[in-house]
Swiss-Prot record:
This is Lysine-specific demethylase JMJ26. It comes from Arabidopsis thaliana (Mouse-ear cress). It holds the Pfam family JmjC. Its main location: nucleus. Belongs to the JARID1 histone demethylase family. Keywords: Iron, Metal-binding, Nucleus, Oxidoreductase, Zinc, Zinc-finger. Binds 1 Fe(2+) ion per subunit. Zn(2+) 2 binds at residues 207, 210, 236, 239. A motif (Nuclear localization signal) lies at residues 62-69. InterPro entries: JHDM2-like, JmjC_dom. The keyword Translocase does not apply. Its EC number is 1.14.11.-. A zinc finger (B box-type) spans 317-347. One of its GO terms (cellular component) is Set1C/COMPASS complex.
Length: 875
């Protein structure tokens, strides 16, 4: 019997198996488990907390009638002859209440002693967190809840309208104080705050959900400003999964990172889709190796099947790179027996073809002309000069012999120039060819039909689309922009794949809505890093190396000062905004270890986890590398940067135009807006005029150019949720974009605000940021424009490999990004790998950090293993 199943746009035919219906496996929502009480009276108190019992109603009526009685007496007193004295007494009473009472949203005022206590509260709570076991503390808490006369649930059930009355405010806080005294009397040393581990707090609030944890008022106000004390009583931050105390922040496994579990049928279809996509590239790699073996057979004057290839000694923890082009070597390569110089197969072909590039070293250096020049004034006498040697060095000859053999590289290129390079292997003999044959055999049993179209963006669905460009006659001016809830559906994954295969960016809205809500305040993250970690790491966290966006240089700054500037802003002496940014902080190789909860929270927020999950994404080729093999650093990486909504034109908080070798997804986790004063705005306007005059003078002196007036025609709109402005270019427009940048390179500034005079690669140099004016000129001269859109808080932006992009921060932003490798973009990854190897030596983008060829072969191997296991389970 023959059946068909469709997934990922692929139709599977199989023999002897019944038709399989592809159903999305939705994890059932677990109901919160009610806290079990260890005392005999726990059921009574739970009933009293959960329902509106007659006793509570009578209690509340009695309190309201008492409040009405007080109001009546107060009104009668106003009619007495001693009216002035009564008013004076009332003022004193109100003043006393204001010092003692607390409201949830508008008037949270603490008594003087509490203020002193809050001032004494250290920025970083004590790292000596006490472990509180359920077995000991829960019994005491349960006993206290049963025997205590204070109605905790009645406190949490009152509305703001009830608490607006002064009498009820006072009574409420007296009850809270009485509750705290009772807690301390019954629990003793265990009556401590879960957040700061201190027991001398005046107000402690117990969670009625877990009946275990307590939080003090200063910690609630400082670390959980979005929660009221009623919220804490109902469900504490720990039970909500948002506790940011040091102990919890260093705990892993508390957050479920996977949103949707795949059943075995879905896994089978995804793996088959991956094998289909990878096989053509595996064949190319095998073909290149077969050609090299045939060449070696000619050198040895033997048959290809008789060529003996010795194994190169290489461990799994070692990366092997070509000494000439810095490309990763996967299997076959040539090596010098004398000096161990190693050459990849691509370089071997280029030597035999006679088109090998010398790849000279990059000599780019920018001249420092002083801080006055950076701010638009005259340059200071230069103490340094630009060391660019424009004289062309003679080309070094490196040719192959007539039989195809290649000698070691000349000494000028790092070799010895003496011995003939020998053919070496890293993998077992015929391992790759056997893998290719195995994949072909597997796919031969199944037929493939053209995929169906799942795109519904052509219909009137404004919620799924976002306008990002105004290209004439183009059908891709709108970007696919689903909600995070929609992406959990199987049909939306197919919808995503259709846009993704075209090289289009994707924006997913509200990615943080499905997370626990952990705080991404930079101060919370910094506190977690400074406590409960190795002392050496903790000491290194006191200072950070940030990038000054104006001079484009690293500056060392105190970590606390940096984060204060994140929320309050920083300026130079002339009131020009100082824009600083931290890249990859903390380092991504330590991010998961130092901030495990934040790492789990980020992964749980990732949409389309079949692609983006860095741990177990079934269509993420980077996850297929076997254990023990050295893996590339793909993140997650954190980016913390200042920002302002107005485009300054010089020193903006930006990520300059660049192109990533792999796919990436970037989520805006936190923003903070810094308001500029009128004095600062006036100073900025004056300084912009100085910058303009400086530009006009320099351009006139160099090329007779004149700076044009900026006329903005951008379609983006900013609002309170806006965070970052993105410009992403189409792959097809890259040649025209590069031509424009080479033509106008002198108009751009980079390090020390010096003009860009030398271009090695207009995109990979990362020296350019296109302002509004440059984007207008680009469209006028070359007819191309990027997708331009604003990333809002909680939005995830998917960037395909090979799409040049730039970002400008409209506010202080905390973004987290992770790289991944999708089957649809393997061809682009390989193209970029070859493009990077053509860059000069010591160019920052030259190294093959991705090792995409290695990923391809191991992805096919791992997918075949998993498919075989699934087939055995089905049989």
């Amino acid at each position: 019997m023959e059946g068909e199943v469709a997934t990922n746009g692929v139709i599977l035919k199989h023999n002897g198996v019944k038709d399989i219906s592809l159903e999305t496996c939705w994890p059932e929502k677990k109901k919160p488990v009610e806290a079990t009480s260890l005392s005999s009276g726990s059921s009574d108190i739970e009933e009293e907390i959960s329902v509106e019992c007659p006793k509570r109603v009578a209690n509340q009526r009695r309190k309201r009638s008492k409040a009405d009685e007080i109001k009546t007496k107060s009104s009668r007193k106003r009619k007495c002859d001693d009216e002035n004295k009564c008013e004076e007494n009332e003022k004193k009473q109100r003043s006393s209440v204001k010092k003692r009472a607390t409201t949830w949203k508008e008037e949270e005022v603490v008594v003087d002693d509490e203020k002193k206590c809050e001032q004494q509260l250290q920025l970083v709570p004590s790292s000596k967190a006490t472990s509180r076991s359920r077995s000991k503390k829960s019994v005491s808490v349960d006993t206290w809840l049963v025997n205590n006369e204070i109605d905790v649930s009645a406190l949490s059930s009152r509305s703001e309208s009830e608490l607006s009355d002064s009498y009820l405010k006072t009574e409420y806080f007296n009850d809270c104080r009485s509750m705290t005294r009772s807690l301390k009397a019954n629990l003793g040393e265990l009556a401590i705050c879960h957040q700061c581990s201190k027991g001398e707090r005046r107000y402690l609030f117990i969670c009625t959900f877990c009946e275990v944890r307590l939080y003090c008022f200063p910690c609630i106000k400082k670390w959980y400003p979005h929660l009221s004390t009623d919220d804490i009583l109902e469900k504490c931050p720990f039970c909500r999964g948002t506790c940011n105390c040091c102990t919890c922040l260093h705990s892993s496994g508390l957050i479920e990172t996977s949103k949707r579990k795949l059943d075995k049928y879905e896994r089978f279809y995804h793996l088959r889709f991956l094998i289909v996509a990878m096989l053509p590239f595996l064949k190319k790699l095998c073909k290149a190796q077969d050609q090299e073996i045939e060449t070696e057979a000619k050198v040895q004057d033997s048959m290809a099947s008789q060529v003996d290839i010795s194994e190169s000694l290489c461990s799994n923890e070692e990366r092997v790179f070509c000494n000439h082009c810095a490309t990763s070597i996967v299997d076959l390569h040539r090596s010098c027996p004398k000096c161990s110089y190693e050459l990849c197969l691509n370089c071997c072909q280029e030597i035999r073809g006679g088109w090998l590039s010398d790849r000279p070293e990059c000599q780019l250096q920018f001249e420092y002309r002083g801080t006055r020049y950076i701010h638009g004034e005259a340059a200071e006498p230069s103490s340094s000069s630009v060391s660019e040697d424009e004289t062309k060095t003679p080309s070094i000859k490196w040719n192959a012999d007539e039989n195809g053999s290649i000698r070691c590289a000349p000494k000028e290129l790092g070799g010895c120039g003496d011995s003939v390079l020998e053919l070496k292997r890293i993998l077992p003999v015929t391992w790759m060819s056997d893998l290719e044959q195995k994949a072909e055999t597997f796919l031969a049993s199944y037929s493939i039909k053209p995929p169906m179209s799942y795109c519904r963006c052509s219909s009137d669905m404004s919620s799924m689309k976002r306008k990002a460009a105004s290209r004439d006659g183009s059908s891709d001016n709108y970007l696919y922009s689903p909600d995070s809830l929609d992406v959990l559906k199987q049909e939306e994954l197919l919808h995503f794949q259709e846009h993704w295969s075209k090289g289009e960016p994707v924006i997913v809205r509200n990615a943080l809505n499905n997370t626990a809500g952990l705080s991404w305040e930079p101060m919370v993250m910094w506190r977690a890093l400074c406590e409960n970690v190795d002392s050496a790491i903790s000491s290194n966290m006191s200072d950070v190396k940030a990038i000054d966006c104006l001079a484009n240089c690293e500056v060392k700054i105190n970590t606390l000062c940096f984060f204060e500037g994140y929320s309050k802003g920083r300026t130079y002496e002339n009131f020009w905004p100082e824009m600083l940014k931290l890249k990859d902080w903390p380092p991504s190789d330590k991010f998961e270890n130092l901030l495990p909860r934040h790492c789990d929270e980020f992964i749980s927020a990732l949409p389309f986890q079949e692609y983006s999950d860095p741990r177990s994404g079934i269509l993420n080729i980077a996850t297929k590398l076997p254990e023990g093999l050295l893996k590339p650093d793909l993140g997650p990486k954190t980016y913390v940067a200042y920002g302002t909504s107005d485009e300054l034109g010089r020193g903006d908080s930006v990520t300059k135009l660049h192109c990533d070798m792999s796919d990436a997804v970037n989520i805006l986790m936190h923003t903070a807006e810094v308001t500029l004063s009128e004095e600062q705005r006036s100073a900025i306007a004056d300084l912009k005029q100085k910058h303009k005059q400086q530009n006009e003078k320099e351009l006139q002196e160099q090329n007779g150019l004149e700076e044009e007036e900026v006329v903005s025609d951008e379609i983006v709109v900013y609002d309170e949720t806006s965070g970052a402005l993105w410009d992403i270019f189409k792959r097809e427009d890259v040649p025209k974009l590069e031509e424009y940048l080479r033509k106008h390179c002198i108009e751009f500034r980079h390090t020390y605000c010096s003009r860009v005079t030398k271009v090695y690669h207009p995109i990979h140099d990362q020296s350019y940021f296109l302002t509004v004016e440059h984007k207008r000129k680009l469209k006028a001269e070359f007819g191309i424009e990027p997708w331009t859109f604003v990333q809002k808080l909680g939005e995830a932006v998917f960037i395909p490999a090979g799409c040049p992009h730039q970002v400008r921060n409209l506010k202080s932003c905390t973004k987290v990004a992770v790289d991944f490798v999708s089957p649809e973009n393997i061809d682009e990854c390989l193209r970029l790998t070859d493009e990077f190897r053509q860059l000069p030596k010591n160019h920052k983008a030259r190294e093959d950090k991705l090792e995409i060829k290695k990923m391809v072969i191991y992805a096919v191997e791992q997918a075949l293993k998993e498919v075989e296991t699934l087939l055995l389970d089905r049989s």
